[in-house]
């Protein structure tokens, strides 16, 4: 049997090699969705943000072959695939844009954004953030920097310098500037790039709080907007044009940051991010509430209509946004992810008996704005969510060893308290892994029934099919790295939705 299996394997590999030769000789350089065949020839690549790979470097971007789970060519025994031309310091997060054959890596060590070409497996450009270092994501559940999916605009928040950075990379009007906004720390941009929301650290906002009726610096959520030429002329030397918090450059403003009003049934309580409905008609702001020092965890809906957008311009254009309603999420809300009209919300609820928080996943029916169910998940700050194969939702958290589950385990209970949860959306069943450190990255390798994670600074691999005892770990011995693995992304995913934080 062993000999027959070996001969069969050799035959399969040989056939695959012949096919590759035929494809190459015929000049075909695409593998699916019209994407270019990359220089490495690897079709299932996982990008790793690696900090301090050696004593002589503070950052690297290696990538693995997720089909074979190796970091080098399948017909070699050593070496490592890597993104060429990368010089960023301490890469922290990866914004995965496989539909554009690229990605953006934020480097916290120098405050830059590296634009990576997946097609060429090299850095195509580096964007300097004019306002300096943007807010980091670890261990917080938000992100402070975002590249629009059309690769045209970069928005970044810097709570230390109290500014928002705007970089317009489009050829018709390139510009880089900062807008003054105290304590701005989170950025969420819709897939179409027409709405760019900014969140204020530790902020609240009551209902019936309207632009022009209140101090423009006293809101909890803002919107970055590019002005039309007529508006630019009208806003000259008026940083508070139409109730804006700031407009820059002041002599002839091009960009403004406008407050988001609240209606009679809407409010904000420590908002941390927003997710957008699949049809693009609404933003759902995640209010962290008690987990972030506030009172009530909830979702706040903001309708996105033609009348609320600034017609005749590009980039952020949410000039007249008004929040309309709140959906209470009693079990906590720090992150959320849509699957059709169902919104999965991760967060923690305070437990008075222990004085600690414990993790929950709340399922929301958005057409009815009602909670359909709540289920236990890992404790900690839930900063990563992504859908995988076999009806699975994967959730990563930081500081999961500071919650109720860890306390119970220390007292002798047989309770897993790891930072990665696999949730089966068909059976509504949670599987929590063993503790390996903070869960800082997840890449769903769709089509192959596995996910890659970065936990405690190392790379791990899991099957999307559980066993009777829980999550199944796969062999990671050929993908581990010397430095600190802080994030990961599936470069060859089918869509830009294979992201975890953006």
Summary of predicted features, one role per range:
Residues 16-18:
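Hydrophobic membrane-insertion alpha-helices, especially the h-region
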Residues 2-13:
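Bacterial N-terminal signal peptides that target proteins for export
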Residues 21-25:
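C-terminal motif of bacterial Sec signal peptides marking the signal peptidase cleavage site
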Residues 26-502:
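Predominantly soluble domains enriched in secretory-pathway, periplasmic, or organellar proteins
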